Design a protein with these regions (language model features):
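Surface-exposed loops/turns
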Residues: 37, 78, 92-93
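Beta-strand-rich interaction surfaces with strong enrichment in secreted/lumenal proteins
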Residues: 32-33, 71-76, 88
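Long, low-complexity ectodomains and other extracytoplasmic segments of secretory-pathway proteins
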Residues: 19-40, 44-46, 52, 107-131
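Surface-exposed binding patches on compact interaction domains or structured appendages
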Residues: 52-81
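Ligand-binding face of N-terminal immunoglobulin V-set domains in extracellular IgSF glycoproteins
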Residues: 82-88, 96-101
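Bacterial N-terminal signal peptides that target proteins for export
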Residues: 1-7
Length: 131
């Protein structure tokens, strides 16, 4: 086999042999709005394995211990949707913006998600009669 044929064969195998995994989502940020102080808030991110191979999530990291995450521990088939559930423990008053990094075989860089809102002492309801 000539060098030209060998290079062509190797190039064809590297391009067509493996379709990269990819994670996609409609929303990378969920705004929780007002959250009552000391009342945890939970949000679900709906994601999709939009690659051609099974997706394996190796790790999910948060930027602080006040946020917990639940995610699939098994391989996610190509084209399948899956959920990443996050819970923020609202123990501090004020605005929050928590980052969640999803590490997988979809690439070297994590997919970043964020959960934001504002922790308040009580939620004001503006319904009722006005003078």
């Amino acid at each position: 086999m000539t060098n030209r044929h060998m290079v062509s064969l190797l190039l064809a195998l590297s391009v067509g042999g493996a379709q990269a995994q990819e994670i996609s989502t409609v929303n990378t940020t969920i705004d929780c709005g007002q959250v009552v102080f000391k009342q945890p808030v939970t949000a679900e991110f709906v994601l999709n394995n939009s690659g051609g191979q099974p997706l394996i999530i190796s790790d999910v990291r948060t930027d602080c211990g006040c946020t917990t995450v639940s995610y699939p521990k098994t391989a996610i088939p190509a084209g399948e949707r899956f959920k990443v559930t996050t819970t923020y423990d609202a123990k501090q008053m004020g605005h929050f913006n928590k980052q969640i990094g999803i590490y997988s075989n979809a690439g070297d860089n994590p997919m970043m998600l964020s959960l934001k809102g504002v922790v308040v002492p009580q939620i004001s309801d503006f319904q009722g009669e006005y003078p």
